[in-house]
Design a protein with these regions (language model features):
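Catalytic-core helical/loop segments in enzymes performing group transfer/polymerization on anionic/lipid-linked
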Residues: 1-177
Length: 177
């Protein structure tokens, strides 16, 4: 996926979220369930088998994966009727810019000589950073971190957070936040 496409997609999802979603009143203590939306068929939760869907104490926090903007808008309208919190409710435009600017900050990362079993892997690390693989996941991970940080700044206590903890950039943002 081209860098420009990833950046544009993140901007557009943020703006669609602001346009189509209702800011919900959130309790001061909440439970969050991290979910990935891969289609606009929202009647079947492929991760938790709808276990949390009707639980009033749990809020789903969706991340959109490989959806067209039309399908994202359709999902956003549906979320207004359910226990969903959108990250955009707690992220500012400045937060989105900061997460997207990661694309350019990565070039400024300085790597010291790094050895693994007497082999210098500095060039390998620099190459991986330069290729920007998983750029979208890195941006979403930063947004997840900022989302959690902003919840704390609004004095919202997280009683529990369920995420897949697959050690991906997306989950690391959740866990660090």
């Amino acid at each position: 996926i081209s860098i420009l496409r990833v950046l544009l997609k993140n901007f557009l999802i943020f703006f669609l979220s602001k346009l189509f979603s209702i800011n919900k009143k959130i309790n001061k203590e909440i439970n969050l369930v991290d979910i990935f939306i891969t289609s606009n068929n929202l009647s079947n939760d492929r991760y938790y088998k709808n276990f949390f869907l009707d639980k009033k104490l749990f809020y789903h926090v969706p991340t959109f994966v490989d959806l067209s903007l039309r399908k994202v808008a359709s999902c956003l309208i549906h979320f207004n009727k359910r226990n969903y919190i959108l990250k955009s409710q707690f992220l500012t435009f400045k937060d989105i810019l900061y997460s997207i600017y990661f694309t350019f900050r990565v070039d400024k990362i300085k790597i010291k000589e790094t050895f693994f079993k007497k082999l210098n892997i500095k060039d390998l690390i620099l190459r991986e950073l330069y290729l920007r693989r998983n750029l979208d996941a890195s941006i979403i991970g930063i947004q997840n971190y900022l989302f959690a940080k902003n919840l704390k700044n609004k004095n919202i206590k997280l009683k529990s957070v369920l995420n897949w903890h697959e050690n991906s950039a997306v989950d690391k943002g959740w866990n660090y936040g």
